[in-house]
Structure formats: structure tokens, C-alpha cells
Amino acid sequence: MKRNKIVFIFGPTAVGKSELLLNFPKGVAEIINVDSVQVYKEFDIASCKPSIELRAHVKHHLVDFLEPIEEYNLGIFYKEACEIIENLRVQKKLPVFVGGSAFYFKHLKYGLPSTPPVSSEIRLHINSLFTTRGKNYLLEELKRVDFERYESISKNDIYRIKRSLEVYYQTGIPISQFLKRGQMLANVLAIGLRRPMEEMRSRIISRVKNMIDCGLLEEIKSLLGKGYNETTPAFKGIGYREFLLWKSRPYSMLNDIINLIVKNSFLYVKRQMTFFDKIPNVLWFHPDDDLKDILDLIFV
């Protein structure tokens, strides 16, 4: 197996990524999850988290580690992913990134985007801190969140001090990491999984029915009973947010909610494939027909 190799396995919701991973040899690779809902504790069924069986077969990272009220974004993913890559290389394990978030895959491969625009709320907050607590407080805060940037700029350059904090507060990523962007990952094997759209529609319908059979309704009631609601970041995921409509419209039929989940899932699959098709140098496979070829590529 090539030294320092990194594998990407991506494809739309319900394409069959988990089935592929069950065929991995034990102890050779570890999975880094590339999904924005499976990261949350308690939100299990509609997020289609890797099964206990799969997680026992091959270790997974970035699954089930955030509280539902916490925000998850590119900055958190990128920071965690880079650390995991380094740790796995020390252990001589193969990092395999698996999921459906094309946005995260793109920026992991090609580096972070240029420093983003900052909301007026963040800018006002930083200015308020400067007015009420002074420059030294901002410097101490910068030292805490981005020591590299703190060391590299003049302690009297209030513009850069403020800007550095604005970027961190907006994204969760130190500005020093943005300034290093363009450092593309090398030795990436990108494998895409795809099926005909009618096949995908059938699989989505089966998946949603299985969610209901596995207790999704009970999970939703439990989550709402704990006080989670439309402001909870984890509730933004498909399969969860639709039930908030049911909560506000109790006379809606469960069947209507199920049909809405199927519809939203299929639209999401289309958006995913549009984004994935723009990523260059991807080897595309049907996950059922080409299983041996895929495994040979990954583990040679």
C-alpha cells in the first residue's frame, strides 16, 4: 500500500457506502466520517449512523461526539480531520474519509477557502469587546484561540487583532490556518459511488420505511421531550426537520411526513451528485457490481 495514502469514498445518501465498509479487512484502515448530522449524540435513526456491527469491524472517527445543541461546521471538521490524519500516519493506519458532504471533501482536498466574510453581528461583538475591555483583552483572547497568529503580528496592530478574532468567531478556524490554504492533500485516491436515479429512489423509499420500523417516531418524541426544537442544530437534518412540521400541525398524517422525507432525501441526492460531478479525478463505481475492484484499489 502506498505510503501516506489517503482514501476518499463518497456518494449520495443511501448509495451503499456502509455495505462497502463491511468488506474492509480488519485493523488496516480507520474511517473518518464526512457527515454533518451523524456527528450528533442521540440523533441516531434518521442520520443513519454506522451500525454497532460496522463500528466494531472498523473504527470510526467523528461520529456521535457532539451534543445536539453544538454547532458543526467546516472549520471544526477540517481541524479534526487534519489531526486524525497525522495520528493515523503515526500508527501506520490508512485514513479513509467516507460520507456525503461534497463541500467538506472539496475543502479537505484543496484547502480552506480564502478568509470568509464576517457577519455584522460578529464585527459589532468584537468592537464591543474592544470598547469595554480594551486591546489587552483582545490580545489575550487571540493568544488563546490562535497562538501562531498572536506571535506573528504587531501587538499594536489593532486592525489585524480584530480581524483575526472576527474570522475565528465566524468560522471556528484560526486565521493562521486560512493563510496556509492551498496546501493540497497529496496521494488522495478518490472513489465515487453512484447508482441510476430510479434505483436511488427505490433505495430511499426502503430506507425511510426502515427508519420508521426502527423507531424513528419514538426517537423524535424523545428528542422533543428533552427540549430540542427547531433552533437545535442537529434538527436541521433530513428526517428530523420534517417532524417539526408535524409538531406544529398535529393533524397532518404521518404518511405525509414520510412522503416529505422521501422527497427531500431524493432532492438532496440530486444536489449531492451535481456537486460530486464537479470534483475532478474521481474513479466512479456502482457499489454492487465493482466491489472487488474497489477493494483492490484501496488496499494495494
UniProtKB/Swiss-Prot annotation:
Its EC number is 2.5.1.75. Pfam families: IPPT (PF01715). One of its GO terms (molecular function) is tRNA dimethylallyltransferase activity. ATP binds at residues 11-18. InterPro entries: Dimethylallyltransferase, IPT, P-loop_NTPase. GO terms for biological process: tRNA modification. Its cofactor is Mg(2+). Gene3D superfamilies: 1.10.20.140, P-loop containing nucleotide triphosphate hydrolases. The record marks 101, 123 as: Interaction with substrate tRNA. It comes from the Bacteria. It catalyses: adenosine(37) in tRNA + dimethylallyl diphosphate = N(6)-dimethylallyladenosine(37) in tRNA + diphosphate. Residues 35-38 are annotated as: Interaction with substrate tRNA. PANTHER family: TRNA DIMETHYLALLYLTRANSFERASE. Catalyzes the transfer of a dimethylallyl group onto the adenine at position 37 in tRNAs that read codons beginning with uridine, leading to the formation of N6-(dimethylallyl)adenosine (i(6)A). HAMAP family: IPP_trans. Monomer. Belongs to the IPP transferase family. This is tRNA dimethylallyltransferase. It comes from Borrelia hermsii (strain HS1 / DAH).
